[in-house]
Amino acid sequence: MITSIDTNILLDILLVDNKFALDSKNLIDFYNQKGQLIICELVYAELSSQFPSGKELNKFLIDTSIKLVYSNEKSLALSGERWKKYSRNRKSTHQCHSCGKKFSIHCPHCKHTVRMRQHIISDFIIAAHALNQSTLLLSRDRGFLKANFADLEVKGKLS
């Protein structure tokens, strides 16, 4: 089994998030025993901001048995296709990253509907990479992933 890890799971542990750190550590420990843990280059880049050097980040990855696996053309093309669909269909609604529920926000002054891109292409690259190069993805961003990558198995905590 190959398990991909999203940045938020690793940041929970690195930044010691009191709400999610234990669940995230348990997820990583559980799936590490089932097979290979991997991250894509975007997760690597996002994690690098938390380390004094690339050498320190690489040591962390070795110590946690996490392997950097680069995206292939299939993953990158899929991320672009899903991003295009997301951009076209998102209209004026926001989406909760946890439950996937959509809602609108209006300006308190002029009552105009506020539009905002909640997800950038990197979120799509991480998910497409996981879909094409692993069995499942560890992430707390399940609402977004369910809406845009229904074909991807996502675990945010042990059930």
Each model region followed by its residue ranges:
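Short, well-structured N-terminal submotif of metal-dependent ribonuclease cores
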Residues: M1-I39, E46-I66
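Acidic, PIN/NYN-like endoribonuclease modules and their adjacent C-terminal/linker elements
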Residues: I2, H109, T113-M116, A127-S159
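Conserved glycosyltransferase catalytic-site signature
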Residues: T7, E41, I120-F124
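Short, hinge-like loop/turn segments at secondary-structure boundaries
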Residues: G54-N58, S87, V154-L158
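Acidic catalytic patch
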Residues: I66-R115
